[in-house]
Amino acid sequence: METFKTKTFLIDELVGISGKNIEEHLKLYKGYVSNSNLVLNKIKEYEKDPVENVYILGELHRRFSFEFDGMRNHEYYFASLVGGKKEINSNGELYKAIEKEWGSFEDWLIQYKSISMTRGIGWVILYYDKQSGHLLNQWVDEHHLGQLTGLSPILCLDMWEHAFVYDYPTSEKKKYVEAFFENLNWETVEINLRAVLE
C-alpha cells in the first residue's frame, strides 16, 4: 500500500546550485518516500504477531522516523526553491516575528548560517512553537535526531553532502549555504508560518 506520494517540484535554474545537483537530490527524495511506504508496510506485516516480532518492530519504528523525516524535510526544502528567488517582505508576519525573536533579521540570519556550519550531516530548521509563540533555530542530526516535538518547520536547509556535492567540496559548504539563500523563495516560507498561525 502506498500511503505517501512523491511530490513534484518544478525548480527553475538556480544560482550556485546546478541542475545536476537538484536532479540527483530529487532522486534521493523519491527514495525517502518509497522507503517510508516500504517500512510502514513492513510494520503492518509484523504487527500481526507483535509479541513474536517485538524487536523487529522496534527497529522498524526507528527506521521509519529516519525515512519519514527525511521525506518531509526534503519537501520543505524543495518547496522553498520553487518559483525562483523572492525577497522576504519586511512588512510581513515572518519578518516581524524574526525581528521580535532575534532583534533583527540580520542577526537571525547570522545565527542560522552559523548553525549550518555544524560538523556532521543534518538540517538547520527554523521552527515555530505555537504554544509559546516563539521561533527557534535548531540543528537536526541526520533527519530525525533533534527534531523538536510539536513544533512546525518553517524553513529547512539540507546540510547533507548530497545537497551540494556536485557543486562544492565539503570544505566549501559555506558557499552552498550562500547559494541556498540566493535562491530562496521567502513567500513560501511566509506561507509556512501563516499555515501554522491559522
Predicted segment positions?
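Feature for soluble, non-membrane regions of globular proteins
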Residues: 1-198
